[in-house]
Amino acid sequence: SPVFADRYVFVGYPGGKLVALAIQNGAPVWEGAVALPKGATELDRVADVVAPPAIDGRLICAVAFQGRVACFDMGQGGALIWARDISSASGLALDGRYLFVTDDKGVVYGLDRLSGSSLWKQDKLLNRRISAPAVRRGNVAVADAQGIVHFLSREDGSFVARQKTDGTPVRTSVQPLGSGFLVQTSGGNVSLIEPQ
């Protein structure tokens, strides 16, 4: 999905590209490499930006499947600030201090948003088809294929709480709303959940 900020529309493309387009005429303004396709087969070379980029101030970050997470400076013509080899099929979230990303195996990372250095890693959700993270009031929320929303501490990635939904998979991204998180399951249930 495109993301709008300032005078630009930001779009992730197959091949691992993040492109800034001018809102007034759609002309490309700059392009950044989130991932560089590599591998022997065409399937190995899939490195698509699969989730909307996240923006905080001048910082824009994106993640690619079979690629990496990368952050760019919008004020410097899309100059690469940092990149880390983390593949994700779900996405990422930013707040004032951290970048949170779920990798394609179900590991959730807390990274320094300005340097990309690891602050914490939560690997106890492996192979649960974890959603993109969402952050609100010190909690990072991710949902899984069993319909469970897991709340992690923003500071160290430890588990804070868990909430069950209707038991069907959460197929959409968790969305911060008010003091909680909006969750939609494949069973059609929409819930506003707060960590308890």
Give the positions of each predicted feature.
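Extracytoplasmic beta-rich repeat domains
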Residues: S1-D6, P28-I55, A79-D95, L119-R137, ...
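Structural signature of WD-repeat beta-propellers
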Residues: D6, Y13-P14, A64-F65, D103-D104, ...
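WD40 beta-propeller blade core
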Residues: V19, A70, Y109-G110, H150, ...
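Short loop/turn segments that connect beta-strands within beta-propeller blades
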Residues: A22-G26, D73-G77, D112-S115, S153-G157, ...
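N-terminal leader/targeting helix
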Residues: V63, R68-V69, Q76-V108
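Loop/turn-rich, solvent-exposed surfaces of beta-rich toroidal or solenoidal domains
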Residues: Y98-R113, S117-F151
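C-terminal closing repeat unit and adjoining cap/tail of repeat-based domains
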Residues: D144-G188, P195-Q196
